[in-house]
Amino acid sequence: MAVKIRLARHGAKGKPFYRIVVADARSPRDGKFIDRVGTYDPRKEPSEIKVDAEKAREWLRKGAQPTDQVRNLLRISGVLEEQKG
């Protein structure tokens, strides 16, 4: 089973709010998920990112692959270090 760390959209139309979740790659964007790792609110200024760093690192150690957007959010929040090279 391929596991991804990705964004699940919530909130009203035109007012997005995202949960950072660990889910099977085959499940729908807003469908079933295995674990919730954090939240992302792009509407606040500056954008609000809350991540449970311990949970995120645990899932990354287990082999979960973050999507590009989640990888950027994890770097901003300090969970992932910048890769040089």
Curated annotation (Swiss-Prot):
Ribonucleoprotein recorded as keyword: yes
InterPro entries: Ribosomal_bS16, Ribosomal_bS16_CS, Ribosomal_bS16_dom_sf
PANTHER family referenced in this protein's UniProt entry, alphabetically: 30S RIBOSOMAL PROTEIN S16, SMALL RIBOSOMAL SUBUNIT PROTEIN BS16M
Xref: NCBIfam families: S16
Classification via Pfam families: Ribosomal_S16
Protein name: Small ribosomal subunit protein bS16
Family: Belongs to the bacterial ribosomal protein bS16 family.
Superkingdom of source: Bacteria
GO biological process: translation
A GO term, aspect molecular function: structural constituent of ribosome
Keyword Repeat listed: no
Keyword terms, alphabetized: Ribonucleoprotein, Ribosomal protein
A single cellular component GO annotation: small ribosomal subunit
